[in-house]
C-alpha cells in the first residue's frame, strides 16, 4: 500500500465507523460482516468496538470465491435452503439486539455467468430465512451501518486504467476516505456538520407533507404518491433504545417511502446497478396503479426481471431518495459499481420493502398489514436503482394541487 498515511487513516476510519456509524455503547453486542481480504480493517474494528465497551464482537466473514463456487457447484437442495445454524445465529443477534456493521468490498461481477435461476433460488431462500433480521433493521430496532472497503476486484472495475492492481486499490481507498470525511482533522465533527445540512432539507419536506412527487428527465416522467404522515429522514437515525447511529457511510441522501399504491409513468436508470454479483445497465421501468408492469435492461435483463417478478412485493416501491447532483460523489465523475456510493451520487428509488420509520410511528406497528394500510410496501427485497442527473426536475404537489419545485436541473430548489 503506497497511499500516504494509509495505516493512520484506516485507523481513523475504523474509529469513525464504530463511534459515529453504529455508535457502540457499553454492553452492546456487535456483529461485523466483512470480506476475508479485509482482515486488517476487521481487526481494527474489533479492537475499537471493545474499546467502546462492547460485551461481544462477532465477525461474520464473507468470501466472493466461496460464494461463487457454492452457486456453481452445490447441490440444488442446498442452494434453495438456508442451514439452521444461519437462522440460529440470526435469532441470537436479534435476542442480543446486536448492532450490525456491514463492510462491503465485493467484486461487482462476482456472480457473472452464474445461472440466473440458481442465483434467484439462493437469494430468495436467504431473504425468506433472514426476514426477521431485515424487518428489525428496517424498523431501526437496532443500530446498523453499511460501509465499504477497497477490494482488489472492485477497485479494478472502478479504475480499469490504473497501472497496477495496487494503484487501483489505493485510488479506491482514497475515494472512500474522502467521501467518508476521514481526511478531516476531526471526522466526527465533520459528520455532525454534514448531518445538520441534510436535516435542514428533511425538515422542509416534512413540514410540506406533499401528497405527490413528479419526476421529469430524459426517459423519465413519473408521478409517485406519498403516504399520509410520511417522514423524510437524512443521515442520522435513532434506534429503539434511543441511540443515534448513521446507517450509510458515505451518505448524501434525504429519503422517505412513497405510497406503494400510487405510481404512474415511467423511469430510466442513469447509473449501473450492481446486484447479486451482476451489473445491470440501461434499466427502464413502467408503473401503473402503483405496480411495475414492465421492466427491461440493456445489460442484465434476466436478472432484473427476476428481481422484480420473482420476489414477493418487488413490483412496488419502498424508497424515494433525493440526492443533489453536485454532491461530492457525483462530482467525482466516478461510477463505483456499488450501490452505497452510486446511490449517493444520484436521486434513486428502491424496488421492494419500505422502512417502517418512513411514516410517523411506523416503527411501533406490530403487523405488516398495519404498514401496508399506511402505504408502506412489504417485500422480500430492497434494491436501490439510480435515476437522477443534471437534467432531472422534481416537483412536490400539495393537497390543493399547488406545485412546488423541489429539484431543478439536478439540484435542490427548496
State the predicted function of each range.
Residues 1-264, 396, 402-404, 412-414:
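Active-site bordering "gate/hinge" segments
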Residues 130-132, 198-200, 209-211, 251-254, ...:
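Glycine-rich, charged/polar anion/phosphate-binding loops
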Residues 205-211, 279-281, 386-393:
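A short, compositionally biased
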Residues 225, 295-296, 407:
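Short linear motifs in exposed loops
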Residues 256-312:
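Long, well-ordered mid-to-C-terminal structural blocks that present hydrophobic/aromatic surfaces
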Residues 260-261, 276-278, 286-287, 311-315, ...:
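A structural signal for short secondary-structure junctions
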Residues 292-363:
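Dual-mode signal for accessory low-complexity, basic/Gly-rich regions
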Residues 368-414:
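Extended hydrophobic packing segments that form well-structured cores
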Amino acid at each position: 500500500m503506497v497511499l500516504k498515511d494509509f495505516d493512520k487513516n484506516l485507523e481513523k476510519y475504523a474509529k469513525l465507523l464504530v463511534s459515529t456509524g453504529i455508535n457502540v455503547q457499553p454492553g452492546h453486542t456487535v456483529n461485523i460482516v466483512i470480506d476475508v481480504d479485509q482482515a486488517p480493517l476487521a481487526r481494527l474494528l474489533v479492537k475499537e468496538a471493545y474499546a467502546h465497551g462492547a460485551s461481544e464482537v462477532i465477525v461474520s466473514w464473507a468470501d466472493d470465491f466461496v460464494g461463487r463456487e457454492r452457486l456453481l457447484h452445490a447441490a440444488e437442495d442446498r442452494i434453495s435452503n438456508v442451514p439452521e445454524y444461519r437462522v440460529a445465529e440470526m435469532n441470537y443477534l436479534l435476542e442480543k439486539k446486536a448492532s450490525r456493521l456491514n463492510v462491503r468490498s465485493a467484486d461487482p461481477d462476482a456472480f457473472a455467468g452464474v445461472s440466473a435461476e440458481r442465483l434467484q433460488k439462493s437469494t430468495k431462500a436467504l431473504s425468506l430465512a433472514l426476514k426477521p433480521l431485515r424487518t428489525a433493521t428496517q424498523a431501526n430496532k437496532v443500530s446498523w451501518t453499511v460501509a465499504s472497503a477497497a477490494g482488489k476486484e472492485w477497485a479494478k472495475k472502478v479504475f480499469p486504467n490504473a497501472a497496477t492492481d495496487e494503484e487501483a486499490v489505493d485510488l479506491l481507498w482514497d475515494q472512500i476516505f474522502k467521501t467518508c470525511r476521514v481526511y478531516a482533522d476531526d471526522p466526527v465533527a465533520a459528520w455532525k456538520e454534514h448531518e445538520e445540512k441534510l436535516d435542514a432539507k428533511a425538515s422542509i419536506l416534512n413540514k410540506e407533507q406533499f401528497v405527490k412527487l413528479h419526476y421529469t428527465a430524459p426517459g423519465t416522467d413519473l408521478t409517485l404518491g406519498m403516504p399520509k404522515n410520511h417522514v423524510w429522514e437524512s443521515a442520522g437515525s435513532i434506534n429503539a433504545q434511543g441511540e443515534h447511529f448513521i446507517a450509510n457511510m458515505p451518505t448524501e441522501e434525504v429519503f422517505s417511502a412513497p405510497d406503494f399504491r400510487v405510481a404512474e409513468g415511467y423511469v430510466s436508470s442513469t447509473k449501473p446497478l450492481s446486484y447479486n454479483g451482476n451489473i445491470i445497465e440501461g434499466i427502464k421501468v413502467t408503473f401503473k396503479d402503483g405496480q411495475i408492469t414492465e421492466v427491461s435492461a440493456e445489460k442484465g435483463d434476466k436478472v432484473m426481471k427476476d428481481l422484480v417478478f420473482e420476489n414477493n412485493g418487488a413490483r412496488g416501491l419502498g424508497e424515494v431518495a433525493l440526492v443533489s447532483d453536485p454532491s461530492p460523489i457525483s462530482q467525482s465523475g466516478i461510477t463505483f459499481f456499488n450501490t452505497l456510493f452510486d446511490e449517493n451520487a444520484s436521486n434513486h428509488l428502491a424496488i421492494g420493502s419500505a422502512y417502517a420509520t418512513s411514516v410517523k410511528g411506523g416503527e411501533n406497528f406490530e403487523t405488516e398489514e398495519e404498514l401496508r394500510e399506511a402505504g408502506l410496501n412489504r417485500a422480500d427485497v430492497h434494491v436501490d436503482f439510480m435515476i437522477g442527473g443534471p437534467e432531472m426536475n422534481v416537483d412536490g404537489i400539495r393537497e390543493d394541487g399547488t406545485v412546488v419545485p423541489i429539484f431543478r436541473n439536478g439540484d435542490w430548489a427548496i
